[in-house]
Amino acid sequence: MGSFDRQRAVPKFKTATPSPLPLSPSPYFTMPPGLTPADFLDSPLLFTSSNILPSPTTGTFPAQSLNYNNNGLLIDKNEIKYEDTTPPLFLPSMVTQPLPQLDLFKSEIMSSNKTSDDGYNWRKYGQKQVKGSENPRSYFKCTYPNCLTKKKVETSLVKGQMIEIVYKGSHNHPKPQSTKRSSSTAIAAHQNSSNGDGKDIGEDETEAKRWKREENVKEPRVVVQTTSDIDILDDGYRWRKYGQKVVKGNPNPRSYYKCTFTGCFVRKHVERAFQDPKSVITTYEGKHKHQIPTPRRGPVLRLLGKTET
């Protein structure tokens, strides 16, 4: 075989040029106009791997399918979910939560802390129902001689607490230092020296006696006016003088007495009229619940609280 034949037997690769492969744009990625590769490197959308740590500012994006076209980058907003890794802040709602309802009576009573014990001695002389209010109003006056201070107390029927205390006038004396009434103590010293009975009539009465006396005060008073030269007239009952003072509008002194019968709380006060000094006015408070004691032998004469024996 000659050299020509050997040349013909060797395949000639360059004799037939293969057809060029068709070039088409990549269906997976197209550089949008106006963007550079550096812009895509900084974009968080390219780092979809779960091994990459989330950014504290951008968060994490789950793996998703991105659609592109020749005009640019198309992103399906429904497929992208933003997850914030920071814990949510729970702020108290100022609108949805109902406001707590305030108890007006309790707030007023607790803030003012009203109490009837103010250090002075009072005597209740009346009570009535005020128009426009369901709570009763009680009236008190100071028991100190020649003190005209009064007060009215409104008490809640529901809770039994004092809602309002209104004072009228001012005290012209210091507060009592003990539980004894100042007026009764002074009168007791005078009576002990004159009557010599040795009893301390200045002590406070028990709670039961005080309540019974207030109930008797609510009963209608009986006023008897007669003309006499003596101050105390004999009505059949026995009395003990426990006080005397000058009241407003009458220069003649008023004397106070109480029945000496055990368990009887009837009281009376005697004074001469301002217009007619010969006229004696006797006012009874309460009713006797016992019979008239047996009269003593001989004429009975009570003058200025003294009993003839």
From Swiss-Prot:
Induction, as annotated: By salicylic acid. Induced by heat stress.
Source organism superkingdom: Eukaryota
Listed Polar residues bias regions: 175-196
Record SMART domains: WRKY
Gene3D superfamilies from the UniProt entry: WRKY domain
Keyword hit for DNA-binding: yes
Bias (Basic and acidic residues) ranges: 197-210
UniProt subunit comment: Interacts with VQ10.
Function comment: Transcription factor. Interacts specifically with the W box (5'-(T)TGAC[CT]-3'), a frequently occurring elicitor-responsive cis-acting element. Functions with WRKY25 and WRKY33 as positive regulator of plant thermotolerance by partially participating in ethylene-response signal transduction pathway.
Protein name stated in the entry: Probable WRKY transcription factor 26
Gene name in the database record: WRKY26
